[in-house]
Amino acid sequence: MSARGIASTLRASVAGLALLALAGCQSAIEQSYEPSVSPSATPQIVDEVQKNDPRAQMGAREHPRIVASYGGEYKDEKTERLVARITGALTAVSENPNQSYRITLLNSPAINAFALPGGYLYVTRGLLALADDASEVAAVLSHEMAHVTANHGIQRQQREEAEVIASRVVSEVLSSDLAGKQALARGKLRLAAFSRNQELQADVIGVRMLGEAGYDPYAAARFLDAMAAYSRFSSVDPDTDQSMDFLSSHPNAPQRVELARRHARAFGPEGTTGDRGRDYFLDGIDGLLYGDSPQEGYVRGQTFLHGKLGIRFDVPAGFQIDNKAEAVLATGPGEIAIRFDGVADTQRRSLTDYIASGWVTGLQPETIHAITINGLEAATARASAERWDFDVTVLRIDTQIYRFLTAVPKGMPSLEPTADVLRKSFRRMSPQEAAALKPLRIRVITVGPGDTLATLSARMMGTDRKLDLFRLINALQITSTIKPGDRIKIISE
């Protein structure tokens, strides 16, 4: 949840929370980030997009929306140089070597890359964190560049009008400006999605570009496998949202992996051809931000912490936290759902009056009570709508009102115990606590004598499945071994 976004009014209706409880954390509210990280003063790009190209105009129109939807631009000049180096090598052997590209690193933990008409290329820091070497990044970029050179973006533009119409219908049905805007944003993001035939065509072109640029042509199949493995890992990781990941818009059928391998064989047997570029890749991503950014706060196990806002709270055991820019969402067993957000306190009225001001549907006025939570002014109430019961808890800190909405199926006894965990755990952080919070980053280290998979993976932070994630980000199989002098990635502060 962003410190900037929390200051804007987030009209979270009780009905919307019921939808959250029904649909789960991924589909309730899609990510809609505000840009929070400034671009570099001298961004590394292959060339400027031609300003008189109508395709460039299409890309230029969508560019700000794409950037905003993925957390803004990520600032790291050495990483930008890495991606520009890879793109330059691919451009030289592409079907249109005169095509220029504007490369944007996106400040998102999602694993994604895509292209827009006019030579706009995007890659998330999450994808760079998963990749094992430069050839795997090249595999993704060559695939996206193939979409550009094959004019796939022009073909898919015809679908955009239908997306807008569908978004208007969603807005009318949900009777929510926020819902309509989010649906429209999802429609715009589908500009980056292609048909199955276009995907296969881009695969073929991309593998050829890989091999001709001197990269390992088998990297395409290898990274498709890596993304599938990450998807399986994430499917049981409660803190991972896959709604904006590459595989959500790029199907990963086994035949697609085999097709990539088959075309790679034209350059020679696997393991005998092409450069992986691992050393300069690792140099380029050392220190890369991993997971949540400071602007959005951090999820650590069952706890949400936000250093800039100076707050923290816990969710009950067994709940899954999804930290989005506009709110923190959590879902638990039995269709229990929680939403936490904040609004600017512009009127300085009592919190009991605030709860009764009309933003809660189905409010039971007789249940409104003023309370104190860890020394903070607060108020609670109950509400009911259709088959749902709700607890509403609000707290005031300085000029902000923080809001918890908890939903359970009607009559379920877990409403009070769930809300009680939130209320009792919410507190201000001390300046020392806030200062001690640090984001997680990719750290590149060299294996030393006596190091083992167990000892190295034990240094991983931000996950309970240390060995699994360690193997994943280092492309290590069950039978893989390491030796002194090898360079590997870990995740730490």
Give residue ranges: language-model regions.
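Extended non-catalytic domains of envelope/secretory-pathway proteins
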Residues: 318-320, 328-329, 336, 341, ...
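Bacterial N-terminal signal peptides that target proteins for export
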Residues: 2-15
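Residue-level recognition of short, solvent-exposed, well-ordered loop/turn junctions
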Residues: 200, 314, 448, 477, ...
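Primarily a LysM-type cell-wall glycan-binding module
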Residues: 431-464, 486
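Surface-exposed amphipathic alpha-helical segments
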Residues: 138, 321, 404-442
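Extracellular LysM carbohydrate-binding repeats and other cell-envelope/extracellular binding modules
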Residues: 465-493
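Signature of long, low-cysteine stretches enriched in small and polar/charged residues
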Residues: 339, 356-403
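A Zn2+-metalloprotease active-site environment signal
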Residues: 11-14, 22-309, 313, 320, ...
